Amino acid sequence: SLSSVSVSSESVIGDTKSEDTETEESEEVVRKDGNVTPGSTYATAASIGLNTTYKATTSRKSVTHWYKFTMSKAGMVQLKFAHANLSSTSNSPAWKIDFIADQFGGMVSVNSGLQDTQNQTAKIGLEAGTYYVQVTGLGVLTIGSSDYSFSVQYEDIYCETEQNDSISTADNYTKLGQTITGSISSTSDTDYYKITSAAKGYLSFQLQHDKVSSKLATDIYSVAVCDASGNTIYTMTSRTDEEKTESVNFGLAAGTYYL
């Protein structure tokens, strides 16, 4: 589930107040076609570009395909996968896609069924670097050959990174007043953001997410502010039917805090 949060800070020194309102616009996503021969191992992964659609064929002789892409700047990525409807009666898994992968699996894995003409992963925030995609044809495809297409979509936006699941690995949220985008993949997924205040002042935050119509009026997110020891200072929940939830404006001493 994709969400975004913005934190506003007002520092108070004597009678003066200053508010950080820096903003940044996302770049437009461009889509085009590309051609590449898949690699058969992690070490021989084929290089692909971002925001580019690639096509390949899975067969008995080419069951596993490896690709890699490089991000020169941190941002949000999402893998999109498509193929023709391959059955009128069964939706058995036809491909397994490991996104942000290594030899042992992926940060995100998606199964695409015979009738699933389109699949996509959650959006994931990543630092600059090189990352891998593994596409594996499952048993139902080994009797013949089948085509698929995919792309890795990139957005240049201020976002979380998917290693921020504890205080020790928290993302450093330096742009107070600017919206940061993240995603929650399960009920056990937790994202941490580090906030540093140089002076005593006030803090407030706003959480936005899409409505979840199947579970109206139940809590879907919990947002807490805690100190460096993990002690909770303030907690707010957001329901499935609320697209935007705002915290109260509360005072904090100078120091380091975590959202």
Each language-model region and where it sits:
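C-terminal edge strands of extracellular/lumenal beta-sandwich accessory domains
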Residues: 2, 10-15, 20-48, 67, ...
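N-terminal compositionally biased, intrinsically disordered segments and leader/signal-like regions
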Residues: 17, 22-24, 38, 42-45, ...
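Surface-exposed beta-strand/loop patches in noncatalytic accessory domains
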Residues: 86-118, 152, 183, 213-243
